A protein has these predicted regions:
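Kelch-like beta-propeller repeat domains
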Residues: 15-365
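Bacterial N-terminal signal peptides that target proteins for export
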Residues: 1-7
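Bacterial N-terminal signal peptides
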Residues: 7-17
Length: 365
């Protein structure tokens, strides 16, 4: 009888605690520390290669201390090793895996401004080679692989514009050349660019003269930009991800107050209606996020950076869930890369003092 009463009391206490915290976040997956990179990096790029390894390129140790170096993460051994160096040290560049298996690295900051230079990494040789230059200098631009294998590059900052620019161009993978195309309706830096199911690209938010609530669609058939519905909240340095039903999640970022205007709000874009609607909020306000939220299990998107907590958006419940475990600090401009086995590599970033970390973590669903 005594054992029964103890068990009953334990159950009652548990129910009372649950009732007292009805909004306590559920846990989804776990974050654990992993082997460090060879160099501390932030604002670098991380690209999953066809062989399952991850190319980490460029970035910075601290302000004005930029890298040419690159390294490879092997998910089998869990370790990093060196590979060929880029021709130009750069930070805030774009990196896109091409259908050929090569990686296009374009633009970025080079210390005294931005660059229009571009190079290709060949995993079979481990070397970077310079390719044709972009038509415009740009740093912190967006780059999206189109259905035809070409790459759309939009916005970013150049030497002369304090905010973003509105120019755009296409990298033709076959000829390895860049072509200037029509301008966006709004200048943007630190926007998101998401490929939709129908082949169009949603470009949302970013900063021009001010932080944008506007969004537009790029149509590869006409090579034109078309305005669409506006975000509910103007934001930049946010993240975005495609959901299984074809809608797009937009989350976090900041308003014009930057560090003091970090956002926890999220919204969803519906290509059928061309409108944004409010979604559940993140548990933590965060900005300076990876542009693309990492897809994990069907209907789930991982959001890391800007907080010690890692969150998962669950499209079935429409809520953000908190993973167990934490990263070591509030790292900004870190990377998150989905691996072939369903895990996600989280790497680098910098805290408030601008000194990057070499730390990495693995998210296990």
């Amino acid at each position: 009888m005594t054992l029964f009463r103890f068990a009953l009391a334990f159950l009652v206490l548990g129910l009372v605690a649950l009732a007292a915290h009805p909004d306590r976040p559920s846990q989804a997956g776990r974050v654990t520390p992993a082997a460090p990179m060879l160099e501390p990096r932030s604002s670098h790029s991380a690209t999953l290669l066809p062989n399952g390894q991850v190319l980490i390129a460029g970035g910075m140790r601290r302000n004005q201390d930029f890298y040419r170096s690159a390294e490879l993460y092997d998910p089998v051994t869990g370790k990093f090793r060196t590979t060929g160096a880029m021709n130009i040290a750069r930070v805030g560049h774009t990196a896109v895996l091409l259908r050929s298996g090569k990686v296009l690295i374009a633009g970025g900051w080079i210390g005294h401004g931005t660059t229009n230079s571009a190079e290709l990494y060949d995993p079979t040789t481990g070397k970077f080679t310079l390719t044709a230059a972009m038509t415009h200098r740009r740093g912190h631009a967006s780059a999206t692989l189109l259905d035809n294998g070409d790459v759309l590059i939009t916005g970013g900052a150049d030497h002369d514009t304090p905010g973003g620019i509105n120019s755009a161009e296409i990298f033709h993978a076959g000829s390895q050349t860049f072509e200037a195309i029509g301008t966006m309706h709004d200048a943007r830096i630190a926007q998101t660019s998401t490929l939709l199911r129908d082949g169009r690209v949603l470009i949302a938010g970013g900063r021009g003269d001010s932080v944008n609530a506007s969004a537009e669609l790029y149509d590869p058939k006409t090579k034109r930009f078309i305005p669409t519905g506006s975000l509910l909240t103007a934001r930049y340095k946010h993240t975005a991800g495609l959901l299984p039903d074809g809608r797009v999640l937009i989350a976090g970022g900041s308003d014009a107050r930057d560090w003091h205007g970090q956002l926890s709000s999220a919204e969803i874009y519906d290509p059928q209606t061309g409108r944004f609607t409010a979604a559940a909020s993140l548990h933590d306000a965060r900005f300076k996020l990876p542009e693309d939220a990492a897809p994990i299990r069907p209907g789930e998107l991982l959001i890391a950076g800007g907080s010690k907590q890692v969150e998962v958006y669950d499209a079935r419940s429409g809520k953000f869930l908190v993973a167990s475990g934490q990263i070591s600090d509030v790292w900004h401009f870190m990377t998150e890369t989905p691996l072939r086995d369903g895990r996600v590599l989280l790497a680098g970033g910098y805290p408030d003092d601008d000194h990057a970390t070499a730390d990495t973590w693995i998210y296990q669903p």
